[in-house]
């Protein structure tokens, strides 16, 4: 279903992916340029601009690809201005939802680290158990929020409500989500594998191939997630 949706507007979809990824890389470049600058003021300015552009382009990329996936899954076409503009409350909700996910995963990791430290001190032979539980907890948080952008954009939920709906979806459909996870991980790993192969064939080619492959793969990932959301969302038949 996701691949069928991608055929609806291929130029818009991959053109948007290329532009958003380009801005994302520009943010990285500005931040890196600040490290080699002798002027403290200019270095601070470059760092601030880099972080700001990095964060804004990441949110724009996730929101845009999610909107495209939802629209194409419903058989609707989108226009460029619908992707380019800031959507006010929805965009803020999406940004806060992503922040909620990061903080929740960090909290789960911190709790797991504290439990591991305690068990390592008291029962060293069992120290692997809290480590495994911590990894499982972080993975569960991230997997439960796989549809967070779709919930915010499609159902116009608040960040906290979208988080709760994500947890509920995981509790009801965890076998389907676990089955989807290897495919998404394989798609995400594909650009890096191609980059390593290109670097082995010719020095200096790895980064360029990785970036180009990432531009191509990200819309496929977003379309797959959006198609899965349409099947598993509340009220879906």
Residue ranges and their predicted role:
Residues 1-237:
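Hydrophobic alpha-helical membrane segments
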């Amino acid at each position: 279903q996701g691949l069928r949706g991608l055929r609806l507007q291929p130029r818009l979809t991959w053109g948007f992916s290329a532009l958003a990824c380009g801005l994302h890389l520009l943010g990285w470049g500005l931040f890196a340029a600040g490290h080699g600058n002798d002027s403290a003021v200019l270095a601070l300015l470059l760092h601030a601009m880099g972080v700001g552009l990095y964060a804004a382009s990441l949110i724009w990329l996730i929101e845009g690809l999610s909107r495209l996936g939802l629209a194409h899954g419903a058989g609707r076409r989108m226009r460029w201005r619908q992707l380019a503009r800031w959507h006010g409350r929805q965009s803020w909700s999406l940004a806060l939802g992503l922040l909620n996910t990061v903080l929740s995963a960090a909290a789960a990791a911190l709790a797991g680290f504290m439990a591991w430290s305690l068990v390592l001190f008291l029962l060293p032979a069992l120290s692997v158990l809290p480590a495994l539980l911590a990894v499982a907890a972080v993975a569960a948080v991230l997997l439960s929020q796989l549809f967070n952008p779709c919930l915010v954009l499609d159902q116009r939920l608040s960040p906290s409500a979208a988080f709760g709906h994500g947890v509920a979806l995981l509790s009801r459909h965890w076998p389907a989500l676990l089955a989807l996870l290897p495919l998404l991980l394989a798609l995400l790993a594909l650009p890096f594998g191609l980059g390593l192969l290109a670097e082995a064939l010719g020095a200096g080619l790895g980064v360029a191939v990785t970036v180009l492959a990432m531009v191509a793969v990200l819309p496929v990932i977003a379309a797959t997630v959006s198609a899965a959301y349409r099947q598993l969302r509340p009220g879906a038949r």
